[in-house]
Design a protein with these regions (language model features):
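NTP/phosphate- and nucleic-acid-binding module
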Residues: 1-185
Length: 185
């Protein structure tokens, strides 16, 4: 679980996304330590509550359930449940989800694996990352009126050299190749 969690953190960091690792509910499948990776975006489908002073973050609907409150927007500015800072609210796009299943399913299927000296019941986990959601979220965070501004780590290229008029009498192709070679250095 921890290895996958760290791998996901590295992925989101490398892509340069503004995201939060959010306490979540694993739903009907069950499990524990449920965490979702949400990329912050005004178009996000989920409302997130997070501390302005710590890593505490939770789906606002889940926090409302825990506090028997009715209105998620009422959480803005309240003390963070971890005692560090005030809560801020922002929308997020869920782009990853991890949680532990423990032995719930391996026991129900009587699944065993060979341990050092005996057969053991394995602990299971669920790990999901949405490649297309990451791309969509990156676009939400990195665009202007002219279009997409790809982060270098997601961009298919950093520079494009276009031979604008290959029929020109000037040796444009040679100039393009010269620029290309200089950029490679």
């Amino acid at each position: 679980y921890e290895n996958i969690r760290e791998a996901y953190i590295k992925i989101f960091n490398r892509f340069g996304l503004d995201y939060r690792l959010v306490k979540a509910d694993s739903g009907a499948i069950g499990g524990s330590d449920s965490e979702e990776f949400h990329v912050l975006a005004d178009s996000g489908e989920d409302l997130l509550a997070f501390s302005d002073k710590s890593d505490y973050a939770i789906n606002a609907e889940l926090l409302v359930e825990l506090q028997d409150d009715q209105d998620p927007s009422s959480l803005e500015g309240k003390d963070s449940p971890d005692g560090k800072g005030k809560l801020k609210l922002k929308r997020g796009i869920e782009a990853g989800h991890i949680f532990k299943l423990g032995t719930k399913y391996s026991e129900s299927f009587n699944l065993k694996i060979q341990g050092d000296n005996e057969n053991i019941t394995p602990h299971m986990g669920c790990y999901g990352i949405g490649a297309s959601r990451i791309v969509a979220a990156a676009i939400e965070q990195n665009h202007d009126e002219k279009g997409i501004i790809w982060p270098n780590s997601l961009s298919p290229y950093e520079v494009v050299i276009v031979e604008a008029n290959p029929k020109s009498k000037e040796n444009i192709k040679a100039k393009c190749e010269d620029i290309y070679n200089k950029l490679k250095e």
